[in-house]
Amino acid sequence: MVQSAPSTEAIQLPKTSESAQLKRIRHTMSHVMAMAVQKLFPKAQVTIGPWTETGFYYDFDTPEPFTEADLKAIKKEMVKIIQQKLPVVREEVSREEAQQRIEALGEPYKLEILQGLTEPITLYHLGDRWWDLCAGPHVETTAELNPKAFDLESVAGAYWRGDETKAQLQRIYGTAWETPEQLTEYKRRKEEALKRDHRKLGRELGLFLFADPVGPGLPLWTPKGTILRSTLEDFLKQEQMKRGYQSVVTPHLARVDLFKVSGHWQNYREDMFPMMAEDDEARGLEQGFVLKPMNCPFHIQIYKNELRSYRELPIRLAEFGTVYRYEQSGELGGLTRVRGFTVDDSHLFVRPDQLASEFLSVVDLILSVFKALNLKKFKARLSFRDPESDKYIGSDDVWEKAESAIQAAAETLGMDYFIGVGEAAFYGPKLDFIFQDALDREWQLGTVQVDYNLPERFDLEYVAEDGSRQRPVMIHRAPFGSLERLIGILIEEYAGDFPLWLAPEQIRLLPVTETVLDYCQQVADQLRAIGVRVQVDCSGDRLGKLIRNAEKAKIPVMAVIGAQEAESETLSIRTRATGDLGSLTVADLTKRLSSAIAEKLPHL
């Protein structure tokens, strides 16, 4: 049965970014923790300690790693500091004054941070015994911190400045709330999240794995996991075919020059794997190959292979293309953050007069995908550029045109949306779908982008009705986003209980005795003939264990087969969702399974 987290509408858990007071509380808590650590561990050097969406952390350089016992002692010391009701005082100083004070404390990391700051330099004091180089904001006194509404959660390794070549630090994570009730609810949700963790369930259900000889962030898919992937791919391919998409296949790598034209090499290089070159000279001239971080330049080459007529447009090219991003090892997380992943990528080449209708059609496709997957809680983010940043390519006019097109489409659809400044891709704005899961965590899934820049950079053209050469507009879209991330989210959303149409194993036949094995195989052959994914449990275990094993494997449908069923050519059907369905003939079961799977019903 698909499980949902219990309703907790009475207790709200706002994000830090949604609450100015939580931002102050959590930021100050990181300082309180650093003060406690340096009192208990005088050799610990401080680095940075920001707030996060659910709490805070602080990175320390220490001779020895922190233990669980250390965390308990640190928390106890933090309670003492809070109960002293210390004033939190902001002080402005000159660079020279800040440098002198930091050098006197012997804090090299703070000295490095200071070098990147402009005056005035601000310090925050906890009473008169501890201070930190910080821009704030903070509470006015530790009396605003509730000693019963925080906890220290874990210790992890981290690199200074996120650079693997620099010092390894100890990061202590904590959480802090305004009330003890919020802390209790947060812990409940976290415990539920651990039960649903896709890394845990993926291992238990035998869907995917990671292997050290292969490397971090590179998942290996088992036969069951591959069925899950293929089912999702086939579903989307069928939906795309109905809408006039054409499938293409492109290589996993290309010459650096391709990505120089697209702008990826200049604007996205830090996220790409290093260049592969034949020798040092070629490397110096940047004449090598790189693994692709995106599929769009390849699809552009297919479009550009021949001169297009206005009558051919829109051209919709689609590919499940594997791309590669050089994520830092500390940023990797199961399937939701990997180094090699498959994007359900498509690029539409349209005339300007087709842009609005094609954009709306893409959104309709994404919404239909969400409906089939029973993903109901999501919101739309219009991801626009930050006009103060220089990381984007293209003119202001082009950006304004693209952003206006996306906003107009969202308003035409009557969508509730919010604008995310600075969330755009470097080449164009996006409409991103942010999904909220059963535990109120947010994930970006589908995305649609309007792009006037890459057609310009690659000099794309089509012959207009009057014979002139015109520039097409590109739409980038991916309903799933990343197939790996989607599967990770679905595992957690369904708690491993996949709907019938998506389950890697849809029905398991449970023979009570060996004498009915031949009949079981006959039934299995009939079900496979209509495309049902079926297995026969030939372990010889007793019926109770057969059922428990099927339940543990979260098989949607079980068919118990004994001598009576074999003689009458029937099956005794049980489902995880509705329990005992009684006796069915093979023909009845076949009909019901076919109908439920075709209609993508959650269960039989």
From Swiss-Prot:
GO molecular function terms noted in the UniProt entry: ATP binding; metal ion binding; threonine-tRNA ligase activity; tRNA binding
Catalytic activity, EC: 6.1.1.3
Cofactor(s) recorded in Swiss-Prot or TrEMBL: Zn(2+)
Superkingdom classification of source: Bacteria
Pfam families in the record: HGTP_anticodon, tRNA-synt_2b, tRNA_SAD
Gene3D superfamilies according to UniProt: 3.30.54.20, Anticodon-binding domain (3.40.50.800), Bira Bifunctional Protein, Domain 2 (3.30.930.10), Threonyl-trna Synthetase, Chain A, domain 2 (3.30.980.10)
HAMAP family, sorted: Thr_tRNA_synth
Family, per entry: Belongs to the class-II aminoacyl-tRNA synthetase family.
Record protein name field: Threonine--tRNA ligase
Organism in which the protein naturally occurs: Synechococcus elongatus (strain ATCC 33912 / PCC 7942 / FACHB-805) (Anacystis nidulans R2)
